[in-house]
Amino acid sequence: MKNKAISNIQIDNNLVRVTKYSFMPGQETGMHKHLYDYIVTPITDGKLLLIDKNGNESYYNLTSCQSYFRKAGVEHNVINSGKQKLIFIETELKK
């Protein structure tokens, strides 16, 4: 892994896990699989490079306060491909 993003779990109970991610340009999460449906709420604008388990690359622009939802099973590495620090909150729905 190039340079790991900082993650801070803010809430973790039987219903949800809420994690704040902070990425400097070029930092990444590392390959991971989402076990639960989840919501991402960007705190800052930014650009992500997502690399899936097959090596396919996709770019996404994030807009501050514009949340999005994904189903469980997504497997990818998330990289800040922008030029500024990127922060988002991920809420995993355990039930």
Place the predicted regions along the sequence by residue.
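A short glycine-rich, His/Asp/Glu-containing loop-to-beta-strand
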Residues: 3-30, 37-40, 91
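Short beta-strand His + acidic residue motifs that chelate non-heme Fe in jelly-roll/DSBH
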Residues: 29-31, 49-50, 75-82
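Short, conserved beta-strand element in jelly-roll/cupin
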Residues: 33-49
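Short acidic-glycine-tyrosine-enriched beta hairpin
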Residues: 55-72
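Ligand-binding loop in jelly-roll beta-barrel domains
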Residues: 73-94
